[in-house]
């Protein structure tokens, strides 16, 4: 590694590379096309990022682009890059939802590295504001999603604007037909790297379900939140359901944050920060908005609505138990959905029925399934910060807030 990367590695207390990092490092350094498949939480971002940073020269020419499916993932990867890059290297995040005029102005800084979403990057390239002629490496993070039928044309459209002689790197948590036939959609001859065996830590993710009629699911979530023990990332299947559920929680004075593709970038960033800082116990989200979302030491993921397929279940559940940490995945299901759930969980995982009360979660603790400290809202002076801005201007209150509902 370059000396500055090695120093950062040592500062963070890292020792060995993870299997996916070890398997892809030389391939990426040598300029090979790569398709890498590895479970969530196995260090995929650093697997492509560190060798990429070693290759980039400080010459004010755009040499590498990282394509991602969402604003949140773009910002998240941007934060990681800022931690690891040389101070002289210029990196920009160019994602949809942000001010395009400001992005155009920032491009005058002549970045060597860009992270962005296909739609916004295509827009900037069409305006001739984003110069692609010197691009040597193109990374697709969450490649299975970027190449899914509903996003394929937009992704391909941008790739075609890049030089034909360039390195292609694709990373994904799941392998599907799209990735297997990637050479049909993109001009590349990849080396395949598959790390299907989970890291030991992933085995510490416990999968449980709570049986409930649909009409009582919101009551279950309120019970969980009122225990005031753990934060949870809660997945629903639609924007409408997310908004309705947020309003119900608000009505019962339960603080939460809402992360959907309908919110602008400022509100979405605010929701994530409120959750990360422990200001709210619940972050409600949809699959699109939370794709690749990385929240350190997240103890619990809740499938409020059961996902449609195994890939989505894997991506959702992968938000907890990352990098060898412990986690708990809870699914709210009807009696008929129990059979469907059994088809979604990992083949080597066990599934248990649970009730929502602290004693059962304590059982999970004894088995070292959830190690994060119990959720304790941060004490604020006066009125608590609005976590979910609703139309009637009501605001949530944290546990120890002295303010009253307006």
Residue ranges and their predicted role:
Residues 203-248:
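Conserved interdomain hinge at the start of the Helicase C-terminal
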